[in-house]
Amino acid sequence: MRRILCLAVVIFIINDVSSQGLGSNKNWKKSGMSLSSPGNKKPTGNNNAVPQKSKMNNVNQNSLSQPKRPSHPGNSMYFMGNQGPMGMMGGFGMGMNNKQMREFMIAKRTHGVSPFLKKKICHMAKVAPPVNGIMPSPPQLYAQGFKIRRIGKWFSHDLDWSEGVAMCHNKEMEHRGCEKTPSAKWGRMFPGMGGMGGMGGMGGMMMGSRPMASCDVTKPNSCGNPALMKCSKYHKDRFGMPVCCATSEMTANQLENMGF
């Protein structure tokens, strides 16, 4: 009888020590349970010690199998926090919502017109553009009187994405922007194609890597109807080619209603 009592005491001590050792595990602490609680102690024999240990292992594995949840990339603060104050000032200055802010940052990172950027971003300059071609920072642009236009499906093409901004030159301020389709005739033949992203519709796929409407400044009708669009020598795509621009805000609205 004494031997059985001594054996039970030894088993109790061993279980208590092992419980305290596992209780110090960080993952066990995160689970919010305590091994030293009276409900988890059953010092009545060897048969109770084994299932108690397996139960503890199961709980421990469950706590380990739950990875930390990363910050969601769709959060606007994620993008703004990684873009720095310059990107934040540019986005807030444009009055963008969260979705437009993300699209703007995508376009900034790709250094070109992004297929996800469904709205044209254009700074209408009230001052002459810089002679050296270097784009000022957004705060300097706002201080110089630049206005920002977001125009439907349209894109601006004479871009310098190093500052994450797009600018239309002052010399053709009457041009609201440059149309996106690869050619004006493709817009007439396939109405609605101008609103497609990526290659700019069927015409863009035919022209390969040139998704904008390049034109010839020496040919007045190279953009189609000269009353609606004309070839601008001041607005160029990222290949340095002149592109077609609307002659006024009124004609820009007409082109947009026509499906450009």
Curated annotation (Swiss-Prot):
GO terms for cellular component: extracellular region. It is found in: Secreted. Residues 23-75 are annotated as: Disordered. Expressed in mantle distal zone, mantle margin and grafted pearl pockets. Not expressed in adductor muscle, gills, hemocytes or ungrafted pearl pockets. Within the mantle, specifically expressed in mineralizing outer epithelium cells (at protein level). After secretion incorporated into acid-insoluble nacre matrix of shell and pearl (at protein level). Not found in acid-insoluble matrix of shell prisms (at protein level). Its main location: secreted. Keywords: Secreted, Signal. Residues 1-19 form the signal peptide. It comes from the Eukaryota. Residues 33-68 have a biased composition (Polar residues). This is Methionine-rich nacre protein. The lineage of its organism: Eukaryota, Metazoa, Spiralia, Lophotrochozoa, Mollusca.
